Amino acid sequence: MSLEQEIKQIVESCGAKLYDIETVSDRGKTIYRVTITAPEGVDLQKCVEISNLISPLLDVHPPVSGDYNLEVSSPGVERKLKKPSHFEHSVGEKVRVTKNDGETIEGVLSDFRDHTLTLQTKNGPIEIPLDQITYAKTIFEW
């Protein structure tokens, strides 16, 4: 079983879902970031609970070489959309998509199937295959 699969099992045992795992560098420090979601939302207690369960696993199976900090958090209101499951769970939300050619499009994600998303824009619906997207995120309007 891969490290990601083991982390996913831990997250799900706590009533949450694994949204993403990434390793980032912030001000010279390496951060192993585990992002989770839950139907009732993610609070600090849930993050601490999951962090405390994942930490011993990472002590035995380090995710990166060298020093790192483990961070467990929610993806936030405005979240990156990378995986097909991210798009599937964001249907009905407003998103901003940057295509491979640099064009940026905003609209409501009305459908996602066969690795193609449909955005309802002010100029009508637009279909965009995932392989034409370099960056996508949800947008929260205050």
From Swiss-Prot:
> Where in the cell?
Cytoplasm
Chief location bin: cytoplasm
Where is it found, in Gene Ontology cellular component terms?
Answer: cytosol
Which stretches are annotated as coiled coil?
none
What domain of life is recorded for the organism? Bacteria
Which CDD domains does UniProt cross-reference here?
YlxS_C
Q: Which InterPro entries does its entry note?
A: Ribosome_maturation_RimP, RimP_C, RimP_C_sf, RimP_N, RimP_N_sf
Residues of the signal peptide: none
Its biological function?
Answer: Required for maturation of 30S ribosomal subunits.
Q: Which HAMAP family match?
A: RimP
Protein name, entry field: Ribosome maturation factor RimP
Q: Which organism is it from?
A: Nitratiruptor sp. (strain SB155-2)
Please name the taxonomic classification of the source.
Answer: Bacteria, Pseudomonadati, Campylobacterota, Epsilonproteobacteria, Nautiliales
